């Protein structure tokens, strides 16, 4: 069974984040997961280096006008990458340093191929925000926003048209 272009893009993001490993020269090992149900991350194994890939609702873009072509539809697909980062109480490295390394590794890896395997027009880096779970002082991290712009045929979301 084939997948729509947006699913291929999402799978590429997960694969790229999963490829961030110390053995390959990165600062840490990251493990990307996608929730199996909307609004329920409760069953995810919360661990240091976990990156939860949240696919948000897409927006229309004006990229269709650039092509002057009818029959195409351009989308801006936002993703929130929720990265868990924590350390032991006796650690001496500032938590900001660890968070900065996670963010930089993810941004660098995702920008190696802005086209998400040829399925997208471009990948745009957005802002980020650090977080702490008030109920669990050890649960800290950063949320990174990216947006992937892609184009498909108006009548066929399985066919890319870049």
Label every PLM stretch briefly.
Residues 1-68, 118, 157-162:
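Small/polar-rich, solvent-exposed N-terminal microdomains that initiate assembly or binding
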Residues 1, 5, 94, 134:
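Conserved aromatic-histidine-acidic binding/catalytic patches
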Residues 54-59, 79-87, 110:
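Generic secondary-structure microfeatures
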Residues 19-28, 46-55, 96-154:
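Acidic-leaning, charged glycine-interspersed low-complexity segments
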Residues 71-88, 139-152:
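Oligomerization/assembly interface segments of phage tail-like spikes and tubes
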Residues 8, 70-76, 84-108:
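Extracellular/virion structural assembly segments
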